[in-house]
């Protein structure tokens, strides 16, 4: 499905107009520009909704019909469950477990260097380390320690300016 189809589900379920919902659904699916298979679905997790979508769009908003819309509920019922055929919503642990063929030699050192070179704020550091906190898996930091997260997601969250450096 695409963001317009998801937004139309939201309109049918919650009222309002397509424009009320399209930005949320477009962000959830924005990772398709990174890869077009199921690996793009990092924002299709509870972590993605809680740590990325809600900080950008807030917990609630009022749609054009005057209805109060809970962002978490919208994401889960109108997008994530739909994409997973109403079977489940994956956790970030599920996503990380599916990350295969990650070269681990020197990974800790590379991630630590990236973190110290790019991050200078304790709250921002906590956001970037949150996948590790949840999963206990070092490779989970590849989700947040990359140019897409630093230069697209963090500025949308209002947590950082884009960084003009080699990644």
What are these regions (language model features)?
Residues 1-167:
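N-terminal membrane-targeting hydrophobic helices
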């Amino acid at each position: 499905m695409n963001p317009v189809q998801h937004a139309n589900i939201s309109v049918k379920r919650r009222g309002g107009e397509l424009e009320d919902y399209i930005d949320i659904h477009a962000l959830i699916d924005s990772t398709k520009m990174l890869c077009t298979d199921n690996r793009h679905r990092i924002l299709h997790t509870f972590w993605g909704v809680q740590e990325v979508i809600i900080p950008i769009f807030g917990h609630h908003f009022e749609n054009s019909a005057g209805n109060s819309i809970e962002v978490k509920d919208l994401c889960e019922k109108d997008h994530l469950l739909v994409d997973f055929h109403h079977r489940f919503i994956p956790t970030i642990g599920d996503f990380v477990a599916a990350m295969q063929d990650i070269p681990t030699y020197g990974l800790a050192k590379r991630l630590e260097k990236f973190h110290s070179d790019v991050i200078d704020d304790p709250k921002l550091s906590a956001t970037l380390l949150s996948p590790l906190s949840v999963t206990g898996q070092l490779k989970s930091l590849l989700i947040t320690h990359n140019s897409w997260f630093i230069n697209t997601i963090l500025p949308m969250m209002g947590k950082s300016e884009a960084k003009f450096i080699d990644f």
